[in-house]
């Protein structure tokens, strides 16, 4: 009987020990939505002539910071990107990220690329046009 009790106690303690040593892997960032305060026309966001600002809105889970980059259209333009802003999570319930960018050029034909940073990186892109 003593051996049986010892075996049960040992099994009970061993099962807790293995749970303690298991690694918890945080979920990677996930972009739920990425939009602007202007409507899309196909795959392009049409910026009205004379508009001076544009607001970018991102809803993302498992994300600490969102980086907002602007870069020209075309191939192999990643090295030409410019950081136009970032937003940092304010609390654990905060899944909304946004910036307002001041447009300082008369025309646009660019990509806005976002990176959601957390335990990994998620990416998304929208296209801007203004003639």
Language model feature labels by segment:
Residues 4-13:
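Sec-dependent N-terminal signal peptides
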Residues 89-100:
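Aromatic sugar-binding surface patches on proteins
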Residues 67-71:
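Beta-strand signatures of extracellular beta-sandwich domains
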Residues 21-49:
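Short, compositionally biased P/S/T/A/G/V-rich stretches that sit at domain boundaries
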Residues 116-118:
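Conserved structural position at the C-terminal beta-strand
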Residues 100-109:
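Surface-exposed, short loops/turns at beta-strand junctions within beta-sandwich domains
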Residues 54-60:
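Aromatic/hydrophobic beta-strand junction motif of beta-rich domains
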Residues 122-131:
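Edge beta-strands of extracellular beta-sandwich domains
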């Amino acid at each position: 009987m003593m051996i049986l009790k010892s075996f049960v106690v040992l099994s009970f303690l061993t099962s807790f020990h293995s749970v303690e040593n298991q690694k918890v892997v945080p979920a990677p960032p996930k972009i739920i939505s990425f939009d602007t305060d202007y409507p899309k026309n196909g795959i392009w966001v049409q910026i009205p002539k004379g508009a001076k600002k544009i607001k970018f809105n991102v809803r993302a889970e498992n994300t600490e910071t969102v980086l907002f980059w602007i870069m020209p259209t075309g191939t192999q333009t990643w090295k030409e990107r410019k950081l136009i802003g970032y937003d940092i999570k304010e609390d654990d319930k905060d899944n909304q990220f946004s910036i307002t960018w001041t447009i300082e050029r008369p025309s646009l034909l660019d990509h806005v690329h976002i990176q959601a940073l957390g335990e990994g990186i998620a990416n998304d892109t929208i296209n801007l046009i203004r003639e």
